[in-house]
Structure formats: structure tokens, C-alpha cells
Amino acid sequence: MRRLIIIINLSLIVAFMMMFADCSDSSNGRKQVSIGYVNWSEGIAMSYLAKVMLESKGYDVMLRNADIAPVFVSMAAGKVDVFMDAWLPATHADYIRKFGDNLEALGVAYKNARMGLVVPSYVTIRSIEELNEHKEKFRNEIIGIDVGAGLMNETERVIREYPVELTLKPSSGATMVAFLQKSIENKEWIVVTGWTPHWMFSRYDLKFLDDPQKQYGDAEQI
């Protein structure tokens, strides 16, 4: 799967280079490209890969890290040239509706992306519907990621619609994984907002909780 993802992204980078042909020049005469990224594992990997490949072709590349909303605002304003981690058609639909007239989709880096609530495999429940009866084991909380992330917005809706009697705790992608790792080391129950592709699924034995209401929707594309 890693090889496939890299091949797809190399083809996208060729598209980037064609698009960036008219980018502004830096003081040394090299074309400048600005890549926005959020602290999500797959986006970091793709952005740094693009940086290396573009620099090998003579571009000056600046990586700009921000939360998801400022990234879209910066793209619409022309301050960021590309963002490689947009989840469509659902998760980032609000941003596309708001800024889409100023944006252009170049291609798909990953198909069948998924998001939802994730637990270690030793947790015995299978479904979101079972969370409430075991909420004390989960300390009455769901460990989330960045405020404003599409996954967080979707999870807030999941909590309302089921409903779920646990509180969504914002953090960051890295902090969420740190909480997950500590709980696994101690064989404690934990539920987090998770998604694939993400390296944590290859490092830890995890599972998505079933979503019988399909609140998180179908597979998406990045």
C-alpha cells in the first residue's frame, strides 16, 4: 500500500509542477511554492514528500503548518498554493462550499479513506451504540484531535444523533496517539477519533466501532 500511495503522489507532484510554472520567483531566481499542511500523519508525509520532489526539480518550497480552517483561508487568499489532505466529498465539504470558487482539485492521493471512533482490539464492545453502558471504563470521554477538524465536527454530530453520553475532548493528532499508546500499555479502555490511512493502525491492534446509523458516512478520497 505504501508503494501505491507514493506512486500516486508522484503523479500529483508532476501536476503541481505544471501548475506552479507561473509561480513567483525568489531572490535566487527559483520558483517558489507554498504547501499548507495540518498535523495529521498522512498529510505530513505527503507534504514532505512533495517538498523533496519539488526541490529536486529546482523549486523553493515553504511548508506552512496550521489548523484546517486557516489552511483553507490561506489557499483561498493565495497565500498557500497547495494542500494535500482534503477529505472529500463529505468531511471538508463545508470548506469547499465556502472557498471552492478559488480552489482547484488536482487529483486523488488515497481512495477508501475512513474515519470514525477507534478502540484497542482488547476493548470488548463492537458498536458506538454500546458506549453509554460502558462510559465509566472510558472515563466518560472521547479523545479527539484539533478543534475545527472535519472529524471533530462529524463526531460532535455522532454524539448528538445516537446520542452518546461521553464528552469529546479536543487535543491534536499527536496528543491523541500519545493517550492511545499510554492506555494500550496499561491495558486501559480508551476511545479516540481515528482515521485511515494512519500509521497507528500498523503499530497497534485497533478497530473501528461499528456505526449502524452510518453517521460517519461512506469511504472518502484524499
Describe each region flagged by the PLM.
Residues 24-26:
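Bacterial signal peptide processing site
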Residues 108-116, 174, 200-222:
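Periplasmic-binding protein-like
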Residues 18-22:
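C-terminal motif of bacterial Sec signal peptides marking the signal peptidase cleavage site
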Residues 40-41, 62-74, 168-179:
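Short helix-initiation/N-cap motifs at beta->coil->alpha
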Residues 50-58, 133-169:
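Ligand-binding cleft/hinge of the Venus flytrap
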Residues 47, 67-101, 178-179, 199-205:
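Pocket-flanking alpha-helical
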Residues 101-148:
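A conserved helix-loop-strand patch within extracytoplasmic ligand-binding domains
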Residues 29-42, 59-64, 139-143:
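Short, well-ordered beta-strand elements
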